[in-house]
Amino acid sequence: MKGKIIKGIAGFYYVKVEENLIECKARGKFRHKDVKPMVGDNVIIQVENGKGVIESIEKRSSELLRPAVANISLAFVVFAIKSPDINFDLLNKFLVLCEYNHIEAIVCLNKVDLVSEEERENVKKRINDIGYEVLYINAKEGLGTDILKEKINGNITVLCGPSGAGKSTLINKLTDKEHMLTGIVSEKIGRGKHTTRHSELIEVSNGYIVDTPGFSTLEIKELMEKEELKYCFPEFEEHNESCKYRGCLHNKEPKCAIKQDVEDGKINKYRYEFYVKTLEEIIEGEKNKW
């Protein structure tokens, strides 16, 4: 039987086959091959003695490692515009992760009622200028959920972002159900209390959304080689191969087209600085491997 993994908890996988949800374990062969089923996987299962067994996993179109979700076609990157303030480094990490996995990213700015229209527009422009769509939402009030449902149609959509951004509240509004516990932001540290316990696909508008555990730890230096990073910045695309030296990393090399674009104001200086900082982390990580 063919189905899709909807949820995974403690080694058990819940596979949707038509209208049925079957609890499954994975065959031992996956462990020996160092392959682990992921939420979102399309799988073939057999039912033995009333228990489901995952026999095979179909090829994945995409995957996120942290959180572990497969076959995602769209990501809502959810950040509160205030309380807590946006951590742009963390936002950039999420965007790089999406680009690396060839997943379309839409930035959803929550709690927009806490700032002025001018502040909203300034943040939106900053994100638009690097090539990403921005949607304003208010998870508590349900503002923006209609357009989000339109985007979800036909996709597996991941909601990612820092804890306290309102992801679980947003899912409750999108599904009209309390699928996840919701928490409050700790006044002491400005972070949300960890409220989501596992990754789970939830059916919405002829598609799926998946919420993921808070405090996602993103270590870009563990994901990619230094040569790959520049392709995760859409604004570099036009001139990535225009530098004097082939394989230019856009850092210390002379006559670099990207550095020239930064000087000319065509590429955001902060984004470029984030790129260089991340590149140096990857290079340092590669040194430590040996």
Swiss-Prot record:
InterPro entries on file: G_CP_dom, NA-bd_OB-fold, P-loop_NTPase, Ribosome_biogen_GTPase_RsgA, RsgA_GTPase_dom, RsgA_N
Q: What domain of life does the UniProt record list for this protein's source?
A: Bacteria
Cellular compartments annotated: Cytoplasm
| Any one GO cellular component localisation term in the record | cytoplasm
Per the UniProt entry, the Enzyme Commission number(s) are: 3.6.1.-
- Residues annotated as domain CP-type G: 61-218
* Requisite cofactors: Zn(2+)
Q: Which residues form a coiled coil?
A: none
What does the entry list as the binding residues for GTP? 110-113, 161-169
Q: How is the cofactor bound?
A: Binds 1 zinc ion per subunit.
Amino acids binding Zn(2+): 243, 248, 250, 256
Q: Name one GO biological process term.
A: ribosomal small subunit biogenesis
Q: Which UniProt keywords apply?
A: Cytoplasm, GTP-binding, Hydrolase, Metal-binding, Nucleotide-binding, Ribosome biogenesis, RNA-binding, rRNA-binding, Zinc
Under the heading CDD domains, the entry gives: S1_YloQ_GTPase, YjeQ_EngC
> What's the main place this protein lives?
cytoplasm
Alphabetized PROSITE patterns for the sequence: ENGC_GTPASE (PS50936), G_CP (PS51721)
A GO molecular function assigned to this protein is: rRNA binding
Q: Which family does it belong to?
A: Belongs to the TRAFAC class YlqF/YawG GTPase family. RsgA subfamily.
Q: How does it assemble?
A: Monomer. Associates with 30S ribosomal subunit, binds 16S rRNA.
Known function: One of several proteins that assist in the late maturation steps of the functional core of the 30S ribosomal subunit. Helps release RbfA from mature subunits. May play a role in the assembly of ribosomal proteins into the subunit. Circularly permuted GTPase that catalyzes slow GTP hydrolysis, GTPase activity is stimulated by the 30S ribosomal subunit.
Entry protein name: Small ribosomal subunit biogenesis GTPase RsgA
Give the organism, scientific name: Clostridium botulinum (strain Alaska E43 / Type E3)
